[in-house]
Every structure is written in structure tokens, then in C-alpha cells.
Amino acid sequence: MIDIGIVGGSGYTGGELLRLLSVHPSANVVCVTSRKLAGKPVTSVHQHLRGLLDLRFEAPSPAEIAQRCDVVFTAVPHGTAMDWVPELLDNGAKVIDLSADYRLPVDVFEKTYGIKHRAPRDAVFGLPELHPEVAGASLVGNPGCYPTGATLAIAPLAKAGMVDRVVFDSKSGISGAGAEPTETSHYPNLAENIRCYRVTNHRHVPEIKQELSRLQNDIRISFTPHVIPAVRGILTTAHVFVKDSFQDTIQDREFISKLYSDFYRNAKFVRLVEGVPMLGNVRCSNFCDIGFEIEKNSDRIVVISAIDNLVKGASGQAIQNMNLMMGLDETAGLWFPGGAP
């Protein structure tokens, strides 16, 4: 069994880690931290886990956690993980960080988040479908939810060098805003409504650019997110405008289908679907469903991806990374369908 610690276990991503790990065949959660809730039962916050967990929140030091754990997940606010990660690593634990602290180069992180990085370390970007090196990593920076859905949506087209410009329109459930209500996520402001926020220059854009530029370095990228009155899920619509030399190519549906099936041949959690993916089919699962439609006599192909923002967009992907880092089957503890309808 793998002894596991969770730093910051009281929020949505911490709770989702606990839900998934509670039925993982090789996971043994031994420590869940929360300074504010230290001493209280974990199930006092995550009541859906009653009968499955018998743990209390703790407030140990990083060294104490590392000495008890093989793997530690840091599910804390941006700018906080960097105060934990070095000591966890130095004391022998492997770390998957669910904040933004280790996703980007230091200079890009500081510019994007306005935070001085106090503890840079080399990390692997934790999108396993594009980064097989996750398997040998000691520190993984788990991707943001929007970059996961956006990058997976068009990676095959980028790898083929086809993309001139892409406009991402993402619609996310309220849980993406975290457990504390904000003006954007407060139910009376969102019920029967859709809210657009951070219309330009969203802080996830650098992650999307970073990953797509590894595949094709001249893509122009625009991204705008919306919050919808749903709890879970992200539906990303990618309007891909191809280079002039590929305008005839994208009219060939069989070619595009093969491009995607070849690219994702070994990606166990990517499902290619006919037509438009549905959030209900991936809800509470680690799958990313991808479909596309070709605009006739045009330079545009529309690619749609659907993920659960808390699972493939956060905690599930973190466990997928853990599986690879620890030499387990990638699907361990994650091979189950979505919760449709």
C-alpha cells in the first residue's frame, strides 16, 4: 500500500482526492491537514465520506508528513504550496501539487500570479497524455482545469502543425470557483444565468500556450471562460482556424478522425465521440470526451471537449499522475464511468 498525505484537505479538491482515494486499491490515506480544522473529523466537512474514512484533520510540519507518507498531494491556494514542497521532497516524499506553483517557469508564474516564487524546483507538468516523463518524476505540477480540457481538445491538430489561430470558449460548473462563495459563484447571481469572467488575459492562458507551443510554436491563442449554473464540468469549444495550406485537409472527416485516434491511441482516459460531447457523460469521472464538427468550405473546425473539473481537471488527474509515478496501472482507482444522467 502507498501511504498518502493531503495538505489542504478541507476544500473541494481535497475532498475529491479523499473520495477517489477511499476506494483506490493501493492507497492508504494516513494524514489530512487543515490548520483551521485541526482535531476535527474529516467527515465533519466531507460528510459524503462517512463510513469510509476515520481520520481527523491535523496540522503537522512538512517534515513530519513526509516521514509518514510516500506521496503527498498539496491542495492549497496558489503561493502556499511553495512553502511545503521543498521540505516534503527533501524528506523523501513524492509530491503532486494541485496549485499553480509548479506548473510554469518561475518568471511566467510571477508575472501571471503576481507572487514572488520563494522555492523554485524542477517539476513535470502533469498532463500524462502529453508528458510520459511523469512516470519518473518526484514533483508534478498538476495542470489547471481549463488548460486540461483546452489542450487535449486540439493537441492532435497542433502536433500536425495545422493551427493558425484558436479561440477557446469554456463553460465551467460553479465548483471551479472553490468552496468559498464569490460574486461570480454565489448562487443568486448565477441561477438561470451565465457569467463571463476574466474575459481576456485569464491566468490559465500561459499554461495553454506553454503546452500547445511544445507541439506547434506559432499558434495564436484566445481564451474566455464562463461560469454556468451547474456544479461540475467544463465544456470547451475550440474554434480552430487552420493555416491556408490545410483548408482542404480539414474537409476530410476521415483524415481528422484518424489524426485524433492515432494521437490518443494509448490515452486511456481520452474518448473520441461522434457528435458533441456531453458533460453528463463525464461527470464524476476521469474521462475527457472529445468530438468535432467541420465547417464546410471554410478554414474552421470546431472541437469540443468535456471533462469533470474536479476529477480530470484536478484531483482525478492528480491520482492518475500518482499512479504513473508509483509504477501502478494508470487507471488504478479511476476506471469507472461518469454519473449520467
Swiss-Prot record:
EC number(s) recorded for this UniProt protein: 1.2.1.38
InterPro entries: AGPR_AS, AGPR_type-1, NAD(P)-bd_dom_sf, NAGSA_dehydrogenase, Semialdehyde_DH_NAD-bd
Pathway membership, UniProt: Amino-acid biosynthesis; L-arginine biosynthesis; N(2)-acetyl-L-ornithine from L-glutamate: step 3/4
Major site of localization recorded for this protein: cytoplasm
Entries under PROSITE patterns matching the protein: ARGC (PS01224)
An example Gene Ontology CC term for this record: cytoplasm
Pfam families in alphabetical order: Semialdhyde_dh, Semialdhyde_dhC_1
Catalyzed chemical reaction(s): N-acetyl-L-glutamate 5-semialdehyde + phosphate + NADP(+) = N-acetyl-L-glutamyl 5-phosphate + NADPH + H(+)
Subcellular localization(s) per the UniProt record: Cytoplasm
GO biological process: L-arginine biosynthetic process
An MF annotation (GO) of this entry: N-acetyl-gamma-glutamyl-phosphate reductase activity
Enzyme class: oxidoreductase
The entry's keywords: Amino-acid biosynthesis, Arginine biosynthesis, Cytoplasm, NADP, Oxidoreductase
Catalytic site positions: C145
Listed Gene3D superfamilies: Dihydrodipicolinate Reductase, domain 2, NAD(P)-binding Rossmann-like Domain
SMART domains: Semialdhyde_dh
Source domain of life: Archaea
PANTHER family on file: N-ACETYL-GAMMA-GLUTAMYL-PHOSPHATE REDUCTASE, CHLOROPLASTIC-RELATED, N-ACETYL-GAMMA-GLUTAMYL-PHOSPHATE REDUCTASE, CHLOROPLASTIC-RELATED-RELATED
NCBIfam families: argC
Function: Catalyzes the NADPH-dependent reduction of N-acetyl-5-glutamyl phosphate to yield N-acetyl-L-glutamate 5-semialdehyde.
HAMAP family: ArgC_type1
Family: Belongs to the NAGSA dehydrogenase family. Type 1 subfamily.
Protein name: N-acetyl-gamma-glutamyl-phosphate reductase
Source organism per UniProt: Methanothrix thermoacetophila (strain DSM 6194 / JCM 14653 / NBRC 101360 / PT)
Classification lineage: Archaea, Methanobacteriati, Methanobacteriota, Stenosarchaea group, Methanomicrobia
